[in-house]
Regions:
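Terminal peptide-recognition signature
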Residues: 103
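Acidic/Gly/His-enriched mid-domain segments of enzyme catalytic cores or analogous surface patches
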Residues: 106-108
Length: 194
């Protein structure tokens, strides 16, 4: 298997198997936590899974680990990602097209931009998961980057289904309670983790 460094890998939890041109496979199903290199994903011809859905999660250090721990039935393939890396794009390309994809990200402008970028490179529809703008108890003003990004997000056809959430943030001038971690730990019973 390839060496892992920087953004040249994808981190995941759940059943996954790489299929190579020579007919060989590498099954990661029994492992709880997996890093797969972009080089290995590029070499394989397809990726199979017995999971019923794919859930990509923006926050690798906390939220991803909490949801992986709650995924006891392993019916969800959980992948840590923010902006789509080459390894994540390879994984998306090689997973079955019929596998439903959900993305759980922060709800500040950068979080919505990540959802947009994932949708731009994904061969399947990506549904937002738990991504609802919530006003902050103490408003967090939009910064210069946010204000530059908002018009692009509001105009993006790929974000039409979440435009109301982005508009609420823009109208209030408030980034809101945007961090995933403020929603608390997921329910241990598995999908939908609530």
């Amino acid at each position: 298997m390839g060496l892992v460094a920087g953004d040249s890998h994808v981190e995941l939890h759940g059943p996954v198997c790489l299929h190579f041109p020579d007919g060989g496979t590498h099954d990661f199903d029994g492992l709880a936590h997996v890093l797969i290199s972009a080089a290995d994903l590029a070499r394989c011809v397809s990726v199979s899974t017995t999971a019923e859905r794919l859930l990509s999660i923006e926050n690798r250090k906390t939220t991803f680990r909490q949801y992986a721990a709650a995924n006891g039935d392993r019916r969800t393939l959980i992948v840590a990602t923010s902006f789509p890396t080459p390894a994540f794009r390879e994984l998306l390309e090689k997973l079955p097209r019929g596998l439903p994809h959900y993305h759980f990200g922060d709800t500040d402008p950068a979080g919505w931009q990540i959802l947009l970028k994932i949708r731009e490179v994904n061969p399947r529809r990506v549904e937002p998961f738990g991504m609802r703008w919530r006003p902050a108890a103490v408003p967090v003003p939009l910064n210069r980057f946010d204000l530059q990004l908002l018009p692009k997000l509001l105009d993006a056809p790929l974000l039409a289904d979440v435009r109301q959430e982005i508009s609420a943030m823009a109208a209030g001038g408030d980034r809101g309670d945007f961090e995933q971690e403020t929603l608390g730990r997921p329910a241990i019973e598995g999908w939908p983790f609530q």
